[in-house]
Amino acid sequence: MNRREMMATKEEISMVGFALVAYAGDARTAAVHALDAAEAGDFDKANELVEKAQQDINEAHNQQTQLLSQEAGGAEMDVTFIMVHGQDTLMTTMLLIDETRYMIRMFKRIKELENKQ
């Protein structure tokens, strides 16, 4: 394989970046709605939404993994701003999903304590 064949184009990298932003953005929206549902006491809906967020973030992660695999295989990568934005969105949304799961449990515990009174 020549050097050109071992190089992902800027367009390919940007397309992955756009996919990361799209999937992670959908995941972020679902996670925020899950928090809203938990705060309202609708824990079934909250859990459903956090699982949707997880599915969306898994799709984003799959996109990222494909690009990482190419780079690990020797392909050269030019970093694009949209890819940096995509990575940032992916990582912050992964953290948000983890925190959302924790907050759902907190809201549930608060509701249980309120019901004891």
Regions found by a protein language model. Give the residues of each.
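Terminal alpha-helical segments
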Residues: 2-117
